[in-house]
UniProtKB/Swiss-Prot annotation:
Uppermost EC category: transferase
Organism in which the protein naturally occurs: Cereibacter sphaeroides (strain ATCC 17029 / ATH 2.4.9) (Rhodobacter sphaeroides)
Reactions performed catalytically: N-terminal L-glutamyl-[protein] + L-leucyl-tRNA(Leu) = N-terminal L-leucyl-L-glutamyl-[protein] + tRNA(Leu) + H(+); N-terminal L-aspartyl-[protein] + L-leucyl-tRNA(Leu) = N-terminal L-leucyl-L-aspartyl-[protein] + tRNA(Leu) + H(+)
Domain of life of the organism encoding this protein: Bacteria
Function: Functions in the N-end rule pathway of protein degradation where it conjugates Leu from its aminoacyl-tRNA to the N-termini of proteins containing an N-terminal aspartate or glutamate.
Name the record gives this protein: Aspartate/glutamate leucyltransferase
UniProt gene name: bpt
EC identifiers of the protein: 2.3.2.29
Keywords for this protein: Acyltransferase, Cytoplasm, Transferase
Length: 280
């Protein structure tokens, strides 16, 4: 029996707003709703084409004159940690990992607030209250987990949270939706450790990829992702090895981006009916 999506998803475009990664540029996103019984299949399919999830929405950068944001993922089987990354793993070997359902807690929010206030006080999420935080964690129509990392303690109640990551589970890997950590533990390099541990989780689960979100050449905020071996980027409609990061440019040109209608026409859907799928 052939199963199809009852209604082909509609794609929309956000209004331009200030880019959080490259100064002086405007960002625009192509997005669609993620809902219903076919949400997991749609998410699995579009994630392979550079889309990311935010609550009940799948989106991909579609800026008018810029194509700098490149979806990035690590090939788990080929990953080899650097000497520095091995030291990070050793330094955090005492942390306890706990995978839970996507349910927000006060301890998570307290850590989230400390992280934002220290690292991203002027960012777009700086004003998030506990209800918005709960929505970010809990509003997921697909398989998601919250991975908590705690320091040793005598009892479960005496194990302070060190780091947290909201993680989606795809048919081909893990996607790190959002992570945050204790800013007072800077010496542990917890951001790097959470990535390294997700590579290990994927390896144990037999999943080939860990999706890191977007790598942006020229952005200091996103430059760290290029330090991981076996990194692939989604560029020109296909996944390819990143090669030398310096070979990629964040150039600004009106011909660097195809029209929205052409972008949407090339999106592969899971056994969907053909037809017009874009709306401005």
């Amino acid at each position: 029996m052939r199963h199809t999506l009852p209604i082909a998803p509609q794609f929309y475009v956000t209004a331009p707003q200030s880019c959080p990664y490259l100064e002086g540029r405007l960002e625009r996103k192509l997005f669609t709703a993620l809902q219903g019984e076919h949400a997991q299949k749609l998410n699995d399919t579009l994630s392979k084409q550079g889309f990311r999830r935010s609550q009940n929405v799948l989106y991909r950068p579609s800026c008018a004159e810029c194509s700098a944001c490149l979806s990035a993922r690590i090939r788990v089987a080929d990953f080899e940690p650097t000497r520095t990354q091995r030291r990070v793993m050793k330094r955090n070997a005492d942390l306890r990992r706990n995978a839970t359902s996507p349910w927000a807690t006060e301890d998570q929010y307290a850590l989230f607030r400390r992280y934002l206030d220290d690292r991203h006080a002027d960012g777009g999420m700086a004003d998030m209250d506990i209800f918005e935080f709960a929505a970010m964690i809990e509003e997921t129509p697909i398989r998601s987990r919250v991975i908590e990392y705690s320091r040793p303690g005598d009892t479960p109640s005496n194990r302070p949270l060190s780091a947290v990551c909201l993680t989606d589970i795809f048919d081909d890997g893990l996607s790190m939706v959002y992570s945050f950590y204790d800013p007072d533990l800077a010496g542990r390099s917890l951001g790097a450790y959470v990535i390294l541990d997700h590579i290990e989780i994927a390896r144990e689960a037999g999943l080939p990829y860990v999706y890191l979100g977007y790598w942006v050449p020229g952005s200091r905020k996103m430059g760290y992702k290029a330090s991981y071996s076996a990194l692939e980027i989604y560029k020109g409609g296909r996944w390819q090895d990143i090669g030398q990061p310096s070979d990629h440019r964040a150039e600004l040109h009106p011909l660097s981006v195809d029209p929205i209608a052409e972008q949407v026409a090339r999106i592969s859907l899971p056994e969907a009916r053909s037809g017009d799928r874009s709306r401005d």
